[in-house]
Amino acid sequence: MKVAIGCDHGGLNLKASVKEVLSALGHEVEDFGCHTAESCDYPDIAVPVANAVVSGKADRGILICGTGIGIGIAANKIAGIRAALCHDTFSAHACREHNDANILTMGERVIGPGLANDIVTIFMETEFEGGRHARRVEKIKALEK
């Protein structure tokens, strides 16, 4: 799969670890920044990653900031995005299987690389179940119109 990834300065180190895991899993990764520890604004990263997912240039996205909250709020402002904040493997599985989340958000100040890498692996490997969940996702999509 093609994965768009991005972070603000608060997620720079975790992003490096996640990129290694994605590559090891055989995914093609496009990094939308940031690339230094210099302070930056997370919406400036979230929007291009979200647009890559919505346009089909990327199959899924991963966004990382200090908490995963702000960058996810910004991404969810883009129509067609279902960004899910996950700091445990259960949520990573459920957000894909039940909610068809297309962007994963995480916080570097909340979790370490070991857990983050497990979350990313599950997020990438879990498919949307459809069925009763498809009806619910369609209702979410209808809210954007």
Label every PLM stretch briefly.
Residues 13-24:
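Short, solvent-exposed amphipathic alpha-helices that sit
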Residues 1-2, 23-24, 49, 58, ...:
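SAM-dependent methyltransferases
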Residues 2-3, 58-61, 80-82:
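Short active-site oxyanion
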Residues 28-39:
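A short beta-strand-loop structural module common to alpha/beta enzyme folds
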Residues 2-6, 10-13, 89-145:
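C-terminal binding/interaction regions
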